[in-house]
Amino acid sequence: MDDWSAEQYLKFEDERTRPSRDLLAQVPLSAPRKAVDIGCGPGNSTELLVERWPQAEIIGIDTSADMLRRARERLPGQTFIEANVAHWVPPANTDLLFANAIFQWVPEHLRQLQRLLGALPSGGVLAVQMPDNLDEPSHVMMREVAHSGPWRETLADAARAKDVLPRPGAYYDALRPLCQHIEIWHTIYNHVLADTAAIVEWVKGTGLRPFVDPLEPTERKEFLREYTARIAAAYPLQADGKVLLRFPRLFVVAIK
């Protein structure tokens, strides 16, 4: 997959940042020495950390050069590092690991969360949010279109049914032995979008990438045409012509 596009991602900045705000509201730290925003993207979530704890050392890490470029432009006084969290080790004196919408992309992420929580000092916090929407029409339709067109072989890996997130109890059992307190909850957002085309624009910034990036321009256009038609059928218009994008998310806050 090509590099992430910060411009595409930020088309829905307010909606994408809201889960970060909701996650941050449950972090019970008054004065962390160091906080790391894992999967910082274009810096919208990092900015929330800076605003809440202006005296703390705030670090953002991401694998995307384009996302990091935008983050550095947005917050020139902060430190941003290109790193893969699967191989990354938290620096000393880190009191908060904050991860908004990143670990759903990380293989064996339960094991990674255990490793990272174990690296925190006593009282440190691991705060994680992940989309839990693979069974939503927005994602089911991606796989259906991938299976139904001339791109079937090209998209075989992308179209393979992905594992949904583990049940909440799996996170509890994995993390509770490593911490003194843990909170786990789901929130279902109903984002008000202009029309069904806006849903397509939303997922083009994230979940649709593995499906459209491997295609040639002509095939990509046809894939998006078919996907858009199916999305229009799956998401009825409201009385004012807008649509509601149902978006479940899982939250975990563990205090070591």
From Swiss-Prot:
The keyword S-adenosyl-L-methionine applies. InterPro entries: Methyltransf_25 (IPR041698), SAM-dependent_MTases_sf (IPR029063), Trans-aconitate_MeTrfase (IPR023506), Trans_acon_MeTrfase_C (IPR023149). It catalyses: trans-aconitate + S-adenosyl-L-methionine = (E)-3-(methoxycarbonyl)pent-2-enedioate + S-adenosyl-L-homocysteine. Keywords: Cytoplasm, Methyltransferase, S-adenosyl-L-methionine, Transferase. It is found in: Cytoplasm. Belongs to the methyltransferase superfamily. Tam family. This is Trans-aconitate 2-methyltransferase. It comes from Nitrobacter hamburgensis (strain DSM 10229 / NCIMB 13809 / X14).
